[in-house]
Amino acid sequence: MKLRSKAAALLLLALAVLLLALLSLRARRDPEPPGFPARPEAAPQRRHAPVPTLPPEPRAFPGAAGRRSPRRQPPRLRPRAGRPRAASREKLARRPGETRSLHSVPPELWIHLAVVACGNRLEETLVMLKSAVLFSHRKMRFHIFTEDALKPEFDKQLRQWPDSYTKKFEHRLYPITFSVGNPQEWKKLFKPCAAQRLFLPAILKDVDSLLYVDTDVLFLRPVDDIWKLLRQFNSTQLAAMAPEHEIPKIGWYSRFARHPFYGSAGVNSGVMLMNLTRIRNTQFKNSLIPAGLAWEEMLLPLYQKYKSAITWGDQDLLNIIFYYNPECLYVFPCQWNYRPDHCMYGSNCKEAEREGVSVLHGNRGVYHDDKQPTFRALYEAIRDFPFQDNLFQSMYYPLQLKFLETVHTLCGRIPQVFLKQIEKTMRRAYEKHVIIHMGPNPMS
């Protein structure tokens, strides 16, 4: 018995020594002291650490929206701050939400937007400007020509908009002035004060290019996009407008005009791009004298010759000017000046059917009556939209519901024409907000 007890004790001792040896070997392989955080817990902290904010460099990230960052990008590929080429400055000006301030955008890259508002056009004008600010990227300067009685209210309303929007534009208020002829006669020509647009090249002498719109215009995509059409001008073109009608044989000018007009159907001046520098420097052919005349010196004699024959005021005068100078006009598609005439007799704007409406022109007073409820629904949706709300939830979805109530009208039967561009614009704005402000996952 004693021998067996000794053998058992020796066996237990040997097992204890072997166990100690194994524990010692394991300790050498894993020297982490107790209490050190486990590696799997530390790794996500490194993976999701905030990316240092760098000044944007557009030429290093063309088309960055929707693109994933590469895994473990080498430091040498990071964009260097403060070295953008001159060609990339325009891209910097166009991107909303960038860390770079809009105030640093060079003035020559600003969009200049002009409007003339008299009488009861205050609300319409503010809604138009709101649509421009909601969707556009580049900084804008608003040139608002209005009566003295309306100036304080314009200034008050625009300054009440949120800072996130007011930083995107500056506004200037101008009196209604006509440099030649009888001011009262010009003021009463067609709509109140509309003839003011004819004198913009002489008044805005420090502005190179300009987009003029009527008060009843709404932008359904960034103003930047129509501004780009200036680049498509050839060496002789100095203004751009859309046709008055897409089907000449049923158009107004081709059937009723008693004066010369551009092309086969005339042009509509409710949305008008102008290269003011070229207009100021051009001698225009005319029906008054054999020699060319400068823009400003041509206006009064032209009006005096044709005033008994014109119906649509300043628009008729513009048609007469470009009848004699067709090489000076660039004609853009009807989607950039979409009016009730394009759908109330059946859809006849093919570009809008393909691309969607880009600029809506609610002439005939359709924003304020029940004749074209589709146009009125869009106007009210933008007018009533709270600036800081979600565009989809507070504008787009309610707009879809309103359109269901307009299907009994010819314009209401094609809701996709009205919604296509505004949906694309909202989606793009949402994606840019997420990518720029939230940032892509750098390790995904």
Swiss-Prot record:
EC number(s) on file? 2.4.2.42
- Keyword check for Lyase: no
Q: Spell out the Pfam families in the cross-references.
A: Glyco_transf_8
GO MF terms listed in the record are: UDP-D-xylose:beta-D-glucoside alpha-1,3-D-xylosyltransferase activity; UDP-xylosyltransferase activity
Lipid bilayer topology: Single-pass type II membrane protein
Q: Which reaction does it catalyse?
A: 3-O-(beta-D-glucosyl)-L-seryl-[EGF-like domain protein] + UDP-alpha-D-xylose = 3-O-[alpha-D-xylosyl-(1->3)-beta-D-glucosyl]-L-seryl-[EGF-like domain protein] + UDP + H(+)
Which Gene3D superfamilies does this UniProt record tie to the protein? Spore Coat Polysaccharide Biosynthesis Protein SpsA, Chain A (3.90.550.10)
* Compositional bias per record (Basic residues), positions renumbered to this chain: 68-83
Zinc in keyword set: no
Residues glycosylated per entry:
275
In the UniProt record, which is one GO cellular component term? Answer: membrane
Q: Where is the composition biased (Basic and acidic residues)?
A: 87-101
Q: Where is this region: Disordered?
A: 31-101
Q: Where are the transmembrane segments?
A: 5-25
Q: According to the UniProt topology, which residue ranges lie Lumenal?
A: 26-444
CDD domains linked to this entry:
GT8_like_2
Q: Which keywords fit this entry according to its UniProt record? A: Glycoprotein, Glycosyltransferase, Membrane, Signal-anchor, Transferase, Transmembrane, Transmembrane helix
The disulfide bonds in this chain are none
A Gene Ontology biological process in which this protein takes part is: O-glycan processing
Q: Which residues lie on this side of the membrane: Cytoplasmic?
A: 1-4
Name where it's found.
Membrane
Q: What does this protein do?
A: Glycosyltransferase which elongates the O-linked glucose attached to EGF-like repeats in the extracellular domain of Notch proteins by catalyzing the addition of xylose.
Q: Which family does it belong to?
A: Belongs to the glycosyltransferase 8 family.
What name is this protein filed under?
A: Glucoside xylosyltransferase 2
Q: Give me the gene this protein comes from.
A: Gxylt2
